[in-house]
Amino acid sequence: MKKSFFEYLMTQRNPQPNNEVEEFANQAFFDQVFPKQSRDFDEISKYLELNAGYLQSMSIFDSAWQRYLESEQF
C-alpha cells in the first residue's frame, strides 16, 4: 500500500535537521490541518501555498515531493 506524502515526510524528521526537507518535516509534524492522507501533488501544494508559513520556499516541497515519488517506486 502506498504511503501518503505526510507519512513519507514523517520519515524525514530529525531533531537536529541537516537540510531543508528535514526542517520541513519537523514543522509539518506540528501542523494540525496538514492534509495527512493525501497523495495528490496539487492538493498538498495548494494547501502549503495558502497555509504553511513555516515553509520558506515551495522548492523545498518540490524536493521532498521528488524524494517521495522515488521512494514509492520500490
UniProtKB/Swiss-Prot annotation:
Gene3D superfamilies recorded: YozE SAM-like
Residues forming coiled coils: none
Pfam families noted in UniProt: YozE_SAM_like
InterPro entries: UPF0346, YozE_SAM-like, YozE_SAM-like_sf
Similarity comment: Belongs to the UPF0346 family.
Name recorded for this polypeptide: UPF0346 protein PEPE_1063
Organism per entry: Pediococcus pentosaceus (strain ATCC 25745 / CCUG 21536 / LMG 10740 / 183-1w)
